[in-house]
Every structure is written in structure tokens, then in C-alpha cells.
Amino acid sequence: MGKSVVVLGAQWGDEGKGKIVDLLTDRVKYVVRYQGGHNAGHTLIINGEKTVLRLIPSGILRENVTCLIGNGVVLSPTALMQEMGELESRGINVRERLLISEACPLILPYHVAMDKARESALGNKAIGTTGRGIGPAYEDKVARRGLRVGDLFDKQSFAEKLKNILDYYNFQLVNYYKVEAVDYQKTLDEVLAVADIITAMVADVTTILDVARKNGDNILFEGAQGTMLDIDQGTYPYVTSSNTTAGGVSTGAGFGPRHIDYVLGIIKAYCTRVGGGPFTTELFDEVGAEIARKGNEFGAVTGRPRRCGWFDAVAIKRAIQTNSISGFCMTKLDVLDGFREVKICVGYKMPNGEIAEYAPLAAKDWEGVEPIYETLPGWQENTFGITDVNQLPENTRNYIKRIEEVTGVPIAILSTGPDRVETMILNDPFAV
């Protein structure tokens, strides 16, 4: 029997999902993106060569894997063509191995213009979006006015729909945000120039997955961003516009929840966050700066510096609840090498004096929250590239064990470097 495994971020994104997906794809026939868009930067380093994938599933680097983009993904034609071009220039066959749901909402230039205009208007209260039009595209989907991949099959109808929706957007952009209108003809020409390439890859993703499951094929679902950025379960309003949790697999790929066998939550050995929003364990001292330096904590897509802090088990417990996490993959363990002590946040002291074991939902409920830490001895030894858990320093193993105890979830995979070989698989999700 085949296995269906979900790989998702259990923190605020940037946990190292791309590497782990790539690592596990030698076991699978299909890799599926089910939410988000080209705001997700998945960095892979294979034999020293760096690849950043934003929209195309990370399985594209394995010749035996078919990659699927489900209906929950918002798709930018421009970003897709650029990414395909980069991969094809390296001899990677994309067009015969990438299939796209016709129900994917399209991200078009007016979405990007609106995203940037809104963030600019918010000033220091900005959400911290990537400015790539993700939110406005999801808005159009929910409002039932958005254009989808399937609309590209009828170019005349597409042109008419585009005219109507662009009038709607330009009225807001010009009259409310006082910015330049988006040109209709330029937008239309750009999309129609690549329409045939995109429609040639359209397929019934739900049926493909159902047949694969019945045939006993292994399937991997690749999440983007992280649990605490989920539109419903995250630190609202400082969230993304999609369901980043495991439930997004069903709504974003048409795969029934009963058929999910394992949920692998990716966690860093510490915590990071990009953009605004609450972050209880954030460090503003030299320790935080050192973690950022050693971890090279800059966004793969935006290049923005990430905020850094100690491991937050309280936030992780919320992620465990919302995802039914089966096991963790801990990444960037080596970044904590050399610290005299390491800390784990095991509780939140709320403004009313109560102790919370689970993170609040709304951002406003995080105000005035203080972290309650357990302090453990650090380790001076170098763990970079270690591939045998028994070779890890005793204090490193104690740190890992304590996180397992506090969260109640076992660590199935350990990563000690960016390359796929710098990994320890303690419990293979596809062998469970």
C-alpha cells in the first residue's frame, strides 16, 4: 500500500520544507502543492548547487516524480513562465512533468498593484506581505469574480472578463489609493502570450490523486508558509491568505482527509518570523543577532531579514492541534552550536497572570504575553553535517529529547545542514 504524507511548516514558515520535500521525493510518484503561490521560497541545495522554487513543487528536481499544482494554489502566469524557464535552461523537463488544476485562481498585474498599494497605505501597520498579489487573488476567488486557469481556454471570453474586473480594480487604485491604473491591453497580451503553454498542462488533479491512491502510489503534499500564518488558525491579521494547515490538502487538492496517512511538521531548532505580527520568544540582543547570522536568516523570495527567537513549544502545541502532526523534522540544529545555554518556551504568562499552554489565535490576545523558559545547557561541539544521531553531543540529544517531551510528538528527521545528505531519518514517514 502506498502512503500519503503531508509536509508542512509548524511555525511561521521558512522552516526548511523544500530540502525535506526534496529528500523524501525519492520515495514518491507525485508531489503536490495545495495552497499559497509564488510567495513561497523553497530553497534546495543539491551537490552544492542552489535552487529556489517558488511555485513549482520541489519534486521537479527528481526525474521520476510528477508534480501537481492543486486548485488551492494562486497561480501567476508570469512567475510560472520565469520559473519554468530557469529550470528548463538547466535541462530539467518541466512541461511533461507538471500538471495544473484548471480551478487555480490567476494572479494578474492588478493583484500585485493592489497588494503594494494597500501595504503602502498601511505604513507602519502593514501586514508585511511579499507584495506579489497573493491576498487580492484569494479575495477574488472568495468573491467569485476571479479569473482562473480554466478561463484561458476561451480567449475571447477571458478578454471580456478581464476588462470588467480591471475596471473594478483601476477605479480603486486611481481614486482611493491615488496610484497609476493597470493597462488592460498590456495585461491581456502578456497573459494570452503564454495561455497555450499553461492550458497544455491542465489536468484533473483530484482524479489523478484518487487513482494514484488506489494504485498504491506514494504521494507527498508540499505545504507553503507555516501553520502560524494560516488565514484561520494563525496570528490574524498577521497571516497569509490561504490555509497552510493540513486541512488545506483536502480543500486545495481535492484529496479526502481520511486518506492522509502521516503529517510531518517541519520545525527549526529555534524560531523565526518575517514581517509584522506577534512573536513571543523574539530576541533583540546579541544572541538573536548571532542566530540570524549563523542561520543566514533572510527570506528566500524577498531577501528580508527574519526575526529570530528561542524555540516556542506553546506555539508548536497549537500547530500540533490544528494539523494532527504525526512527527517532526527539526532543521538547522547546527545553528545552535556554540551557545552556552539554549532555551525552550514552555508556557505563556498572560497579562491577567494566568499561564497558557497553547498559543492564542488573534494577534491582539498576544499583547503583553511573557514567555516562560526552561534553560538547558548548550553545546560547544560542531554538529554540522552529522548523519548519525549517536554522534551528536549529549546536550544536543537532551535538547531534542526535551522538545519531544514538552510537545508530546517524536522527532522523525533531523537536519544538520542545507544539503539533502546532511540529514538523519530516524523514522521514515513513508515506512510507518
From Swiss-Prot:
Mg(2+) binds at D14, G41. Pfam families: Adenylsucc_synt (PF00709). InterPro entries: Adenylosuccin_syn_GTP-bd, Adenylosuccin_syn_Lys_AS, Adenylosuccinate_synth_dom1, Adenylosuccinate_synth_dom2, Adenylosuccinate_synth_dom3, Adenylosuccinate_synthetase, P-loop_NTPase. Its EC number is 6.3.4.4. GO terms for cellular component: cytoplasm. It catalyses: IMP + L-aspartate + GTP = N(6)-(1,2-dicarboxyethyl)-AMP + GDP + phosphate + 2 H(+). GTP binds at residues 13-19, 41-43, 306, 332-334, 415-417. It is an enzyme of class 6 (ligase). The active site is at D14 (proton acceptor), H42 (proton donor). SUPFAM superfamilies: P-loop containing nucleoside triphosphate hydrolases. GO terms for molecular function: adenylosuccinate synthase activity; GTP binding; magnesium ion binding. Gene3D superfamilies: Adenylosuccinate Synthetase, subunit A, domain 1 (3.40.440.10), Adenylosuccinate Synthetase, subunit A, domain 2 (1.10.300.10), Adenylosuccinate Synthetase, subunit A, domain 3 (3.90.170.10). It is found in: Cytoplasm. GO terms for biological process: 'de novo' AMP biosynthetic process; IMP metabolic process. Binds 1 Mg(2+) ion per subunit. IMP binds at D14, E15, G16, K17, N39, A40, G41, H42, T130, R144, Q225, T240, R304. Keywords: Cytoplasm, GTP-binding, Ligase, Magnesium, Metal-binding, Nucleotide-binding, Purine biosynthesis. Pathway: Purine metabolism; AMP biosynthesis via de novo pathway; AMP from IMP: step 1/2. SMART domains: Adenylsucc_synt. Homodimer. Belongs to the adenylosuccinate synthetase family. Plays an important role in the de novo pathway of purine nucleotide biosynthesis. Catalyzes the first committed step in the biosynthesis of AMP from IMP. This is Adenylosuccinate synthetase. The lineage of its organism: Bacteria, Pseudomonadati, Pseudomonadota, Gammaproteobacteria, Pasteurellales.
